[in-house]
C-alpha cells in the first residue's frame, strides 16, 4: 500500500525504493516487478528499467510491457534485440501507429547513426549534475531550463524560500536561467531569472517572439488551480503557457490554457505568427500531441489544430 500510494502521487524514486524492498523480502509478483520497472521507466533509469522489464517480457502478452522493454533496450544501445521485441509488439498490436511506423522501416536506426557521424556533439561545461535542457537563443543570450537550484527562490536581493524537491525524480523544481554568449561562443555569467519568471513550482522551456517577449510553461499551482484525482485523492497541477512581456515583465496566461487539460512547451515560428505547443486536450492521437495555432494582434491563439498522425502517435 505504501509503494502504491507513492506511485499514485508520482513519487517514483520513493516508490522504486519501496517496491525494491518488497522484492528483496521475497514478494516478486508480476505486479510488483511491473510497478518497479515502470518507476525506473518514468525516471529514465534505462539500465534498471531494462533489467526488470526483462523478467516480465518473456512470458508477457501485455503490449505496453513489450513496447517499453523494446524502448529501454534501444536506449541502452541494444538495437537488434530492441527490434526483436518491437516485432513482437507488432504481432500484438498490428494496427497501432507505432507498429505501422516500425514496419515501414524496421532498420531505421543504422541510418540515423550513420547521419549522426556528420555532427560534432559536445557536452557543455554549463551542465550541472541535475537536469539541464531546453536551450534557446535570444538577443545574444542562451536560456535553459534546469533543476540546479537547490537553495530557494531569489527575490529582493535575497533567497526567501526553502527549496523543496519534486517527488517524480527527487530533484528541485525546474527554473529558467540565462547565460551571456561570449565573443568566442562560450556561455558565461549564469543568471537565475527573477521571481516574476521563476516561482517555487516548475517553469521552463522558454521561447521568444521578435519583440523579445518570453513564452514559457508554468504549473497551475502558481494560480491555485489543480485537479483532484477521485481515485487517489491526490491533487495534480496542470501546465499552462504564459507570456512575459519585455520591459514591464507583465505575466499573462494564454487563452488556450484550460482547467481541463495541460498545454506546454511553447515554440514560436520565425515570423512570430504561429505558436507550436503540446497538449493532452481531448481529441488527440495519444497522451500529449503537438498542436499549432495562429497568434492574432492581441496575442490570443486562434485556429488551433493538431499536427496529425504523421507527427503525433
Where are the model-predicted features located?
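Canonical tetratricopeptide repeat
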Residues: 35, 68-69, 102
